[in-house]
Structures are given as structure tokens and as C-alpha cells.
């Protein structure tokens, strides 16, 4: 994973948890040539949903990407997460 900068932001998605959802989300980014720097996905306890956190570049296309993500059938909610984007570096250290 690359070093994060102030130009990165975390998007938090709540999605329906079933096979293929991650493919739809990542496919949207791929089709728009919008790089995802980091991904974390965890199921929501006692639910059929999951949270996906995406570390992405905060550029002029981001608002349009958020709008497109929100239109995906299995996305229940998408928002900017106010956490420090460097949390992805801390997670990476854990797995090294």
C-alpha cells in the first residue's frame, strides 16, 4: 500500500452482504479509472449487511463517484468517513 497523504479520504459504505457485492463496487471504480488505495470490509453483527471502508484519492471526481456508488443496487448508504486516512497504515502494520 502506498503512503497516504492529505489527498486521501475514507468512504464508508453500508452494503447488503452477499457474493458479488465487492465486485460491483470495485468494478465501478475500475470502469471509471479511479484507484482504490485500500479496502477493509467487515460484516455488521447480527445483520445481513457489511461495512466497506475505501481509501481513495480526494480529487474533483470524488463527488461524482459517491453519487454513482449510491446508485448501486446493494449499497444501502455511502458517506465520507471523518477518520484519519492514515488508519489504513496502522492496519497494514498489523498484517505485516
From Swiss-Prot:
GO biological process: branched-chain amino acid biosynthetic process; isoleucine biosynthetic process; L-valine biosynthetic process
Chemical reaction(s) catalysed: 2 pyruvate + H(+) = (2S)-2-acetolactate + CO2
Cross-referenced Pfam families: ACT_AHAS_ss (PF22629)
A Gene Ontology molecular function term of the record: acetolactate synthase regulator activity
GO cellular component: acetolactate synthase complex; cytosol
Lineage, top ranks: Bacteria, Pseudomonadati, Pseudomonadota, Gammaproteobacteria, Enterobacterales
Recorded family membership: Belongs to the acetolactate synthase small subunit family.
Domain of life: Bacteria
Oligomer status and interactors: Dimer of large and small chains.
Protein name: Acetolactate synthase isozyme 1 small subunit
Misc remark: E.coli contains genes for 3 AHAS isozymes: ilvBN, ilvGM and ilvIH.
Amino acid at each position: 500500500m502506498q503512503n497516504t497523504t492529505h489527498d486521501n479520504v475514507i468512504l464508508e459504505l453500508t452494503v447488503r452482504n452477499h457474493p458479488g457485492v465487492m465486485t460491483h463496487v470495485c468494478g465501478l471504480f475500475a470502469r471509471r479509472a479511479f484507484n482504490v488505495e485500500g479496502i477493509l470490509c467487515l460484516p455488521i453483527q447480527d445483520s445481513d449487511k457489511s461495512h466497506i471502508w475505501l481509501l481513495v484519492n480526494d480529487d474533483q471526481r470524488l463527488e461524482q463517484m459517491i453519487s454513482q456508488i449510491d446508485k448501486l443496487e446493494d449499497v444501502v448508504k455511502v458517506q465520507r468517513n471523518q477518520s484519519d486516512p492514515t488508519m489504513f497504515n496502522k492496519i497494514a502494520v498489523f498484517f505485516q
